[in-house]
């Protein structure tokens, strides 16, 4: 990988991991447009570690409080502070974890085509638009602390759909949150907290594959990938949460429709 490819792909991954757009669509589109080779598993691990560092650092107070209160709740066998939110993140992760174990092979073999990604980008983009319309009509939107266990499980099941390339994990979890009556910022915050265990699990599995495959590692590329994806992801989270209530989801929906259409034109000759 040359320096330009490292910079572009790391920044793209950092931005698209948390925006309600599809990271897989971008990682297919950019190499196709400029003729780059596949970035490789080691670089994928690096940029995921960068985005993980960004979201953990941004929500460091929440993560610390949830972790502390979760252990305290286990010791006291009662709810303590933010322990319920910690349990919510754990419960919301389970459906995606199960789906990943059951369908990982099928999805990698059958659903990673550019056309699947294009249609998923468009279809789930329209669902995001609909959920935002529903949210605007909700008289008293809730925050992430008010979710019932049923709500959490439904958002977790929605997150499992993100295994379909082109869906966008953040997009589909925000969609579910908005449809369940969360405010835009509440849906986004819970989506970002849910990303932490998912990124940990995905990075762990990829690291195992990397070790077992004895793949040569470009440590300079990995280091740059971690740093650049972390910076871009942190800035993305900050400005997205700052502007979300004002601009809503429509700009991202329009972008997804354009992106999906471009992929269709490039890969099917539409």
UniProtKB/Swiss-Prot annotation:
A Gene Ontology molecular function term of the record: undecaprenyl-diphosphatase activity
Membrane-crossing residue ranges in chain numbering: 1-21, 39-59, 87-107, 114-134, 147-167, 190-210, 221-241, 247-267
Protein EC: 3.6.1.27
One cellular component (GO) term of this entry: plasma membrane
Topology within the bilayer: Multi-pass membrane protein
Location relative to the cell: Cell inner membrane
Top-level taxon: Bacteria
Family: Belongs to the UppP family.
Stored HAMAP family: Undec_diphosphatase
UniProt-listed NCBIfam families: PRK00281.2-4, undec_PP_bacA
PANTHER family for this protein: UNDECAPRENYL-DIPHOSPHATASE (PTHR30622:SF4)
Additional facts recorded: Bacitracin is thought to be involved in the inhibition of peptidoglycan synthesis by sequestering undecaprenyl diphosphate, thereby reducing the pool of lipid carrier available.
Role according to the record: Catalyzes the dephosphorylation of undecaprenyl diphosphate (UPP). Confers resistance to bacitracin.
Protein name: Undecaprenyl-diphosphatase 2
């Amino acid at each position: 990988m040359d320096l330009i490819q490292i910079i572009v792909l790391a920044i793209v991954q950092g931005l698209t991991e948390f925006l309600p757009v599809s990271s897989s669509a971008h990682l297919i589109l950019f190499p196709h447009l400029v003729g780059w080779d596949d970035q490789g598993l080691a670089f994928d691990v690096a940029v995921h570690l960068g985005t993980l560092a960004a979201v953990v650092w941004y929500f460091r107070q929440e993560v610390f409080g949830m972790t502390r209160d979760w252990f305290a709740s286990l010791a006291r066998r009662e709810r303590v502070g933010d322990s319920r939110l910690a349990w919510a993140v754990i419960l919301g992760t389970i459906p995606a974890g199960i789906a990943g174990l059951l369908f990982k092979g099928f999805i990698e073999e059958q659903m990673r085509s550019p056309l699947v990604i294009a249609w998923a980008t468009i279809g789930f983009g329209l669902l995001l638009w609909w959920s935002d319309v529903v949210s605007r009509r909700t008289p008293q939107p809730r925050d992430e602390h008010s979710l019932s266990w049923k709500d959490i499980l439904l958002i977790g099941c929605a997150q499992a759909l993100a295994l379909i390339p082109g869906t966008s994990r953040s997009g589909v979890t925000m969609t579910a949150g908005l449809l369940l009556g969360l405010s835009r910022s509440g849906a986004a915050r819970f989506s970002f907290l849910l990303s932490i265990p998912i990124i940990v699990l995905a990075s762990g599995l990829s690291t195992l594959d990397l070790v077992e495959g004895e793949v040569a590692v470009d440590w300079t590329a990995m280091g740059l990938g971690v740093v650049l994806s972390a910076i871009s992801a942190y800035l993305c989270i900050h400005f997205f949460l700052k502007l979300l209530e004002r601009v809503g989801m429509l700009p991202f929906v329009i972008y997804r429709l354009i992106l999906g259409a471009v992929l269709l034109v490039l890969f099917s000759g539409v």
